[in-house]
Curated annotation (Swiss-Prot):
Domain text: A Gly-cisPro motif from one monomer fits into the active site of the other monomer to allow specific chiral rejection of L-amino acids.
Record PANTHER family: D-AMINOACYL-TRNA DEACYLASE 1 (PTHR10472:SF5), D-TYROSYL-TRNA TYR DEACYLASE (PTHR10472)
Record-linked Gene3D superfamilies: D-tyrosyl-tRNA(Tyr) deacylase (3.50.80.10)
Organism from which the protein derives: Erwinia tasmaniensis (strain DSM 17950 / CFBP 7177 / CIP 109463 / NCPPB 4357 / Et1/99)
Main EC class the enzyme belongs to: hydrolase
This protein's GO CC annotations: cytoplasm
UniProt keyword annotations, A-Z: Cytoplasm, Hydrolase, RNA-binding, tRNA-binding
Entry EC number(s): 3.1.1.96
Keyword flag Amino-acid biosynthesis: no
Motif Gly-cisPro motif, important for rejection of L-amino acids: positions: 137-138
UniProt name for this protein: D-aminoacyl-tRNA deacylase
Presence of keyword Hydrolase: yes
Catalytic activity: glycyl-tRNA(Ala) + H2O = tRNA(Ala) + glycine + H(+); a D-aminoacyl-tRNA + H2O = a tRNA + a D-alpha-amino acid + H(+)
Protein family per UniProt: Belongs to the DTD family.
Amino acid sequence: MIALIQRAQQASVSVAGETTGEIGPGLLILLGVEKGDTPESASKLADKVLGYRIFGDENDKMNLNVQQAGGSVLVVSQFTLAADTKKGMRPGFSAGAAPAEAEKLYDYFAACCREKGATTETGRFAADMKVSLINDGPVTFWLQV
């Protein structure tokens, strides 16, 4: 399971002109589910994302996690993160989980974030989404479990 996390001043996601999720300061989490991922890997990745210290403390040192910084998270499904880009000029998606399984694990990941106390908004799985982001930094990390 892959999370591309971006520190945001604000972020939102919409489907067909309707906003489905919106946050102020926090993290935009683009989530890719791979074959072999499990609820345990989703929970482990949620722990890692929520605990990752990429927000500035009183000395402007990256020392606070999203919850310590008072931020929220916006989780958006992104199957393209599981793409194989090693050969050719077209990505391959055979490493991605089947859509039904990926949706269950995406929902479970978001539920884990909520259960761990994070204010959590989401996109809509497998929809054609428009994502808006004001990136803070920019600060972007690729996390994988």
